[in-house]
Amino acid sequence: MQKAGCRLEHPSATKFRNHVMEGDWDKAENDLNELKPLVHSPHAIVVRGALEISQTLLGIIVRMKFLLLQQKYLEYLEDGKVLEALQVLRCELTPLKYNTERIHVLSGYLMCSHAEDLRAKAEWEGKGAASRSKLLDKLQTYLPPSVMLPPRRLQTLLRQAVELQRDRCLYHNTKLDNNLDSVSLLIDHVCSRRQFPCYTQQILTEHCNEVWFCKFSNDGTKLATGSKDTTVIVWQVDADTHLLKLLKTLEGHAYGVSYIAWSPDDSYLVACGPDDCSELWLWNVQTGELRTKMSQSHEDSLTSVAWNPDGKRFVTGGQRGQFYQCDLDGNLLDSWEGVRVQCLWCLSDGKTVLASDTHQRIRGYNFEDLTDRNIVQEDHPIMSFTISKNGRLALLNVATQGVHLWDLQDRVLVRKYQGVTQGFYTIHSCFGGHNEDFIASGSEDHKVYIWHKRSELPIAELTGHTRTVNCVSWNPQIPSMMASASDDGTVRIWGPAPFIDHQNIEEECSSMDS
């Protein structure tokens, strides 16, 4: 009080706390009488008249006294003092005329033959600090916080302070929990940019033409890249070194590969081509064999695909008005006429498909009851979009506008991210990092931009590519790994700075201070 200028809790409450923890029940009961004027109902009952208020307060005091005496009774029983316990039951608890059903239960504990039996039947920790602390937690609910501090209040405040610092840390990208033991309270929490995936770990050069798309598998162990050179390359991620090596090359996509989708269990890949492509390829990832090559008509344009969560169906479409639902053998299950599709996404409900179209909107299509509804409306063409894991947020790449974040539940534009150069090329952005706290996108100025989800300004601009960066994919299982695909024919793998090399990091990753 003298140093901080504020009172922690009422002196009577402090005495009450100490006497309860010491098991001095007579003194605790006297303290309770002193606290009587300060008692209130935890349910904030609105009462009328002085008599009703008095009766309500009296009832609360009785409840608190009952809890005290119950603990006293159980401790006597555990100590083998049956006569003293019986005295408490008959002469102190019963006269309160409160919760007679509980009185009957308590009386049954007299038949317990040993302490272990008592603790098991009463679901009670036994005499000591643990059970008395629980008792205090219950008693505290009847006292205002200004009279008695809520349980573990200091720990709560410290944890909130740590959480706030982490929320404000632009580069926080770890799975550390909020346990106070895992952080230092001596200094503010700050993550170094060197721990962030803004340093080139590896450059993949096996493609011999523009690389249009890249996507990590759902389990994070593989990366698929699609190129104008007509191939899909599947890369294996080393679990220890996080380096990638070529696993399989899938060939034969005559028009090139502009979009790839992993099945939910990562056993299949579906690959699409650019606007002139009427074919879709379904590959078995493990064997490298082509399971299905689907084409409904040579007039079709199949440029986007999305898997149903059941892994047995997928939807595909394009800007010439095709919108199909198919099985794994390429059989047409359903179709929607006249929808000029730019990008697709299947929601977790297993029946709703989101599709961006040439009317600068995203609509939801239900293939079961054939209903549709407008969800997002933009003023410029939506070139691509992706959905967060929880299905709440949509990340859009909008022609001439850049990257926009929408809340699908409230159907509102949340944020416009600055910095990226977006014309009419199709650029694919992504959510990423721990808890999907970050957003990354390619750009026509040859850079990869990274934002914290809550900040409009980029926190990092990654340089190294020499032409447009078409796609960025964040590893869903390794928050410190990201891949980018570019028209320069390369795929770059980004990760933290090596511990032994701290030179030239500023050239690889420039941070924008907000």
Swiss-Prot record:
Gene3D superfamilies: YVTN repeat-like/Quinoprotein amine dehydrogenase
Gene Ontology annotations for the cellular component aspect, listed alphabetically: cytoplasm; GID complex; mitochondrion; nucleus; ubiquitin ligase complex
Subcellular localization(s) per the UniProt record: Cytoplasm; Nucleus; Mitochondrion
CTLH domain location: 9-84
Keywords: Cytoplasm, Mitochondrion, Nucleus, Repeat, WD repeat
Record-linked Pfam families: WD40 (PF00400)
Keyword Cytoplasm listed: yes
GO biological process, one term: proteasome-mediated ubiquitin-dependent protein catabolic process
Function: G-beta-like protein involved in cell signal transduction. Acts as a negative regulator in MAPK signaling pathway. Functions as a scaffolding protein to promote G beta:gamma-mediated PLCB2 plasma membrane translocation and subsequent activation in leukocytes. Core component of the CTLH E3 ubiquitin-protein ligase complex that selectively accepts ubiquitin from UBE2H and mediates ubiquitination and subsequent proteasomal degradation of the transcription factor HBP1.
PANTHER family per record: WD REPEAT PROTEIN 26-RELATED, WD REPEAT-CONTAINING PROTEIN 26
Subunit structure, as described in the record: Forms homooligomers. Identified in the CTLH complex that contains GID4, RANBP9 and/or RANBP10, MKLN1, MAEA, RMND5A (or alternatively its paralog RMND5B), GID8, ARMC8, WDR26 and YPEL5. Within this complex, MAEA, RMND5A (or alternatively its paralog RMND5B), GID8, WDR26, and RANBP9 and/or RANBP10 form the catalytic core, while GID4, MKLN1, ARMC8 and YPEL5 have ancillary roles. Interacts with DDB1-CUL4A/B E3 ligase complexes. Forms a complex composed of at least WDR26, a G-beta:gamma unit, and PLCB2. Interacts with AXIN1.
UniProt protein name: WD repeat-containing protein 26
Source organism: Rattus norvegicus
